[in-house]
From Swiss-Prot:
Subcellular location: Cytoplasm
Name used for this protein in its record: Isopentenyl-diphosphate delta-isomerase
EC annotation from Swiss-Prot or TrEMBL: 5.3.3.2
Cofactor: FMN; NADPH; Mg(2+)
Function summary: Involved in the biosynthesis of isoprenoids. Catalyzes the 1,3-allylic rearrangement of the homoallylic substrate isopentenyl (IPP) to its allylic isomer, dimethylallyl diphosphate (DMAPP).
Single Gene Ontology MF annotation: NADPH binding
The entry's keywords: Cytoplasm, Flavoprotein, FMN, Isomerase, Isoprene biosynthesis, Magnesium, Metal-binding, NADP
Keyword Metal-binding assigned: yes
Chief site of localization: cytoplasm
Length: 344
């Protein structure tokens, strides 16, 4: 694939992600009910939102992987880096595979660090890459951590996608040699417990469930196919909420992404065991539709509302939130029982 073809594909992904963005997502958060406390017995001043992670993050949300690899997406990354710095949140790069193949594309990713010089940045490579490529991706961004993304469904549907999914040896090798923490993530199809246990056996400690319900790469890649012949996979995978249930009790540090649309979605994900919650589509949508300044104001208010919701629930930190009363829908409870998953 030529540089122009690679760049065009990256631009297509951004265009289609926005085209198919849904303001009401289907990630399962509507099936989770947090119960109102008439006597919260707390104050907003007492709330500590700092996540229970060894990353020194100040907030339980972060900007998750999106883009890079073309002049247009490089400009988006510059804005995203600037936004992360202004909000004081971590940010993950889009897949750096194209820049590892073509050094001329490195600036479209490195602009993240240029605009967020002191922030926490996660580099990003696919699980098909070896340890040397992972090290190069980290160096490219002077990254604080590395995401390894799992995207089998996307690759299957992508006309020019990979067809080799022998990934576990690569993941194990990257973990063994990495100088930074590793987060293994799905890109929109979620996890089942068996695969999470396999990752644990490889030495993985941090997992982003990347559940179904948000940016849908099955739909995006199918739209790029001339025959649109994979439409039946648009609902493939486990939702973000189902994936969090699959992860409960394993001892992994879970991050939750996929279909997060509101501060309440964030709090629900945290209550289900996520240590932090990432957003991609919502951030991209606001940047494209409203511009940088309005997006910054929106997410500043978003962070403030997280504090308000904690106080409303009568909790002051993540540990206390784990005891907040919660009810699952009948369908979600049936899923939990059918899969033999721990209770909440």
């Amino acid at each position: 694939m030529t540089q122009s073809q690679q760049s065009h594909r990256k631009d297509e992904h951004v265009f289609l992600a926005e085209k198919y963005f849904q303001s009401v997502a289907h990630a399962g958060f509507d099936q989770v009910r947090l119960l109102h406390r008439a006597l919260p017995e707390t104050t907003m001043a007492a709330v500590d939102l700092k996540p229970d992670l060894p990353f020194n993050w100040q907030w339980p949300i972060y900007i998750n992987a999106m883009t890079g690899g073309s002049p247009q997406t490089g400009k988006l990354n510059a804005q995203l880096g600037q936004l992360a710095q202004a909000l004081g949140v971590a940010i993950a790069s889009g897949s750096q595979s194209v820049a590892l193949r073509d050094p001329q594309l490195v600036p479209t990713f490195a602009t993240l660090r240029d605009h967020d010089p002191n922030g926490f940045i996660l580099a990003n490579v696919g699980a098909g890459h070896h340890a040397t490529a992972a090290e190069a991706a980290v160096a490219m961004l002077k990254a604080n951590a590395l995401e390894i993304h799992l995207n089998a469904a996307q690759e299957v549907i992508m006309p020019e996608g990979d067809r080799d999914f022998m990934w576990q040896a690569n993941i194990k090798s990257i973990i063994a040699t990495s100088q930074v923490p590793i987060v293994v993530k799905e890109v929109g199809n979620g996890f089942i417990r068996e695969d999470l246990q396999s990752l644990q056996q490889l030495g993985v400690q941090f997992v982003d469930v990347g559940g179904r319900g948000g940016t849908n790469f099955a739909t995006i890649e199918n739209a790029r196919r001339s025959g649109h012949d994979f439409a039946y996979l648009q609902d493939w995978g486990q939702t973000t909420v189902e994936s969090l249930l699959e992860a409960r009790g394993l001892g992994l540090a879970m991050l939750a992404t996929g279909g997060v649309r509101s501060p309440l979605d964030v709090v629900k994900a945290l209550r289900l065991g996520a240590h932090a919650v990432g957003m991609s589509g919502l951030v991209l949508h606001h940047l494209i539709q409203t511009g940088y300044e309005a997006t910054l104001a929106y997410f500043q208010n978003f962070l403030h509302q997280l504090r308000q919701l904690y106080a409303l629930l009568g909790v002051t930190n993540w540990q206390e939130l784990q005891e907040a009363p919660i009810v699952l829908s009948a369908d979600l409870e049936h899923y939990r029982q059918a899969r033999g998953l721990p209770g909440i």
